[in-house]
Amino acid sequence: MARRSSFQSCQIISLFTFAVGVNICLGFTAHRIKRAEGWEEGPPTVLSDSPWTNISGSCKGRCFELQEAGPPDCRCDNLCKSYTSCCHDFDELCLKTARGWECTKDRCGEVRNEENACHCSEDCLARGDCCTNYQVVCKGESHWVDDDCEEIKAAECPAGFVRPPLIIFSVDGFRASYMKKGSKVMPNIEKLRSCGTHSPYMRPVYPTKTFPNLYTLATGLYPESHGIVGNSMYDPVFDATFHLRGREKFNHRWWGGQPLWITATKQGVKAGTFFWSVVIPHERRILTILQWLTLPDHERPSVYAFYSEQPDFSGHKYGPFGPEMTNPLREIDKIVGQLMDGLKQLKLHRCVNVIFVGDHGMEDVTCDRTEFLSNYLTNVDDITLVPGTLGRIRSKFSNNAKYDPKAIIANLTCKKPDQHFKPYLKQHLPKRLHYANNRRIEDIHLLVERRWHVARKPLDVYKKPSGKCFFQGDHGFDNKVNSMQTVFVGYGSTFKYKTKVPPFENIELYNVMCDLLGLKPAPNNGTHGSLNHLLRTNTFRPTMPEEVTRPNYPGIMYLQSDFDLGCTCDDKVEPKNKLDELNKRLHTKGSTEERHLLYGRPAVLYRTRYDILYHTDFESGYSEIFLMPLWTSYTVSKQAEVSSVPDHLTSCVRPDVRVSPSFSQNCLAYKNDKQMSYGFLFPPYLSSSPEAKYDAFLVTNMVPMYPAFKRVWNYFQRVLVKKYASERNGVNVISGPIFDYDYDGLHDTEDKIKQYVEGSSIPVPTHYYSIITSCLDFTQPADKCDGPLSVSSFILPHRPDNEESCNSSEDESKWVEELMKMHTARVRDIEHLTSLDFFRKTSRSYPEILTLKTYLHTYESEI
């Protein structure tokens, strides 16, 4: 994974809006890109800030040409309407609708009429312009949807096709639960799903808005990486605002990363139109794609995309549960049927790969459920709020010395018992959101409760003159919320037959699309190979990363007298010779590794120094640089008991004679800092014997912790670990510190950490992680699992207060587990934040392990 900052100003492409009041939708044509001055590499700018309007010339023979005509010539491509640059006869020649989009019995064998939208004449097959149902109505063939499922074991393409073409059929606002309507409403989509490869849902990126997610699908990047952090945004360096109704969105400087069509063209693979002007009917878009598929070999693109503004438009208007949603879904399905019938008519239905995919879901939302910041703040006129299903706050006035994000956060935190949003400084947002490392993301962020909106004040809520709300649905919420999930279906010769796969995140699709086209992906946030199980054959075979630093295995026994920790309790060990026995135990490897490192030793992927420390109940990789473990691993059986801690061990720490005193923490640092305490990575409560309990109080098991965070950590170790072990027939737990002071989602180097903890020998982690693994089949114990694994991971923010949980004054049982669920994470997120590599020694294939690493336990109900 490349550092996100590298994507901020590299390869670019414009993406265009389709919002109400703007006469365009997302669009790109393969040869549209022209090199801009001042850029060293990559596809430079598309379009200037001002449209040109020369309309001289004609579209005769040029409708939907793949190459954009440059000034002073007029244009006939799919986006000329958006830039008022079409030839004068574009509508007349290219947007024909006469006699509709289908053949009827009375049209079969008709005399060709060039005014018709599509043809039913005897020569239409040869000319590639038949209506998509021509062979069904006029030749007695069956509709594609009426044919039985067939397993396409190899692509059956006409001569001249170098690779199976890829068609991406993207639908806006398609909530995953819409698929439950089944074949009665969507027979064509249901057939794609049942005959091909599908997931119960696909997770969008946050925010669950259209622009960020469509561009993520195209690039494999998080919004903080590609720069499109919302449908509207302000860039403080540009001092400019990007929004749906303005022309600034046409400026190339907003768009980072390398989208699929540029990846294709840079590697010699032709790409067709990805986006369409909204005035072009869906049927015309399908017919155009089908006509492009009949082009000569040297002109024919290998990748195409169709985009539908539905069902998003209707979902906003009627809400996701409105009975009015049935017709828009039927219309989308009808278009899918036209595509598949058209492919069958061209004998390409066993050749082409089709991806049917959404950008986000839809939730039931109305004006009546709106939180107003004026009920919390007295100065709402001094702030700018990006409102709606999430809130982003900045000062209305630049260089406002009185603007204090922390003070605003304090005034918005836990002020009402029925508060429907939670304020965060962006660096404190759950790491799984990947929504902090971009200057366009404001310092203050409001996570809004599902089904609610946030606005500055009542006057900011737009209603109809009648006073009624003009919308019943919206999206943008936390991307783990089930209503925000969307659809994924893959169908064709390269996808598996009748296969259901686990849910995944849309950052992974870019790599899959590259694999389908035989392309090498540009750097992206996906994990290449994690979706290999979708495909019949895999062109990319991932390999495990090489270990950079191998550990030391301490052999020297330091003298007890060498240590002055300032908190030792060894003088309380009775009898005195027992101390020697306890220390000798520390050099006994025994079966520790087999018992506590069930999936192999984590690899360190950067240069450092660390030691492997064995104990009866756990194993650690101890950092000589950070003076704490990088990881600690232990296995807890279903039968494990939670025991109490003896009084004489509650406030002391033992020296570890295997580690030099100079590489050991000192308790005096904690005694001198009343704001800091310490905790343990292996929980003393789970020690298997009184002797083993002494190992848990070794200084090498100690980590710095704020007293407030210790409440979270102790409850997790004392109660939740045992709970999970009981529920899952045993678990393996790996925990450790995270350092992400610059909140870029990547491991901080030693030099970077020193910048933030100057003057301290013990760096304070920004987060702590925990990876909890068991057998997916709970009838098998964790340490004897021979089937698929199940994993739950957490990245817990290490903060000096628990104000994120408004009921943190209550018993931990009332709030800690909910806090942890909010900060659920993928193993892959933890790997990026620690530069560690987990699960290196298992009987599972490496792609299967990558699938496990990219899984997110959402703790949401079923879709």
Curated annotation (Swiss-Prot):
Detected in blood plasma (at protein level). Predominantly expressed in brain, placenta, ovary, and small intestine. Expressed in a number of carcinomas such as hepatocellular and prostate carcinoma, neuroblastoma and non-small-cell lung cancer. Expressed in body fluids such as plasma, cerebral spinal fluid (CSF), saliva, follicular and amniotic fluids. Not detected in leukocytes. Isoform 1 is more highly expressed in peripheral tissues than in the central nervous system (CNS). Adipocytes only express isoform 1. Isoform 3 is more highly expressed in the brain than in peripheral tissues. Disulfide bonds join 59-76, 63-94, 74-87, 80-86, 103-120, 108-138, 118-131, 124-130, 149-195, 157-351, 367-469, 414-806, 567-667, 569-652, 775-785. GO terms for molecular function: alkylglycerophosphoethanolamine phosphodiesterase activity; calcium ion binding; hydrolase activity; lysophospholipase activity; nucleic acid binding; phosphodiesterase I activity; phospholipase D activity; polysaccharide binding. Zn(2+) 1 binds at residues 172, 210, 359-360. The record marks 853 as: Essential for catalytic activity. Residues 145-502 are annotated as: Phosphodiesterase. A motif (Cell attachment site) lies at residues 127-129. Residues 1-27 form the signal peptide. Its cofactor is Zn(2+); Ca(2+). The active site is at 210 (nucleophile). One of its GO terms (cellular component) is plasma membrane. Induction: Up-regulated in massively obese subjects with glucose intolerance, and during adipogenesis. Keywords: Calcium, Chemotaxis, Cleavage on pair of basic residues, Disulfide bond, Glycoprotein, Hydrolase, Lipid degradation, Lipid metabolism, Metal-binding, Obesity, Repeat, Secreted, Signal, Zinc. Residues 830-851 are annotated as: Required for secretion. Ca(2+) binds at residues 740, 742, 744, 746, 748. Residues 598-863 are annotated as: Nuclease-like domain. Changing residue 307 to Q: Reduces lysophospholipase activity by about 70%. Zn(2+) 2 binds at residues 312, 316, 475. Residues 28-35 form a propeptide. One of its GO terms (biological process) is positive regulation of lamellipodium morphogenesis. It catalyses: a 1-O-alkyl-sn-glycero-3-phosphoethanolamine + H2O = a 1-O-alkyl-sn-glycero-3-phosphate + ethanolamine + H(+); a 1-acyl-sn-glycero-3-phosphoethanolamine + H2O = a 1-acyl-sn-glycero-3-phosphate + ethanolamine + H(+); 1-(9Z-octadecenoyl)-sn-glycero-3-phosphoethanolamine + H2O = 1-(9Z-octadecenoyl)-sn-glycero-3-phosphate + ethanolamine + H(+); a 1-O-alkyl-sn-glycero-3-phosphocholine + H2O = a 1-O-alkyl-sn-glycero-3-phosphate + choline + H(+). Isoform 1 and isoform 3 are active from 45 to 60 degrees Celsius. Secreted lysophospholipase D that hydrolyzes lysophospholipids to produce the signaling molecule lysophosphatidic acid (LPA) in extracellular fluids. Its major substrate is lysophosphatidylcholine. Can also act on sphingosylphosphorylcholine producing sphingosine-1-phosphate, a modulator of cell motility. Can hydrolyze, in vitro, bis-pNPP, to some extent pNP-TMP, and barely ATP. Involved in several motility-related processes such as angiogenesis and neurite outgrowth. Acts as an angiogenic factor by stimulating migration of smooth muscle cells and microtubule formation. The nuclease-like domain is most probably catalytically inactive as residues that are essential for catalysis in the DNA/RNA non-specific endonucleases are not conserved. However, it is required for the stability of the protein and the catalytic activity born by the Phosphodiesterase domain. This is Autotaxin. It comes from Homo sapiens.
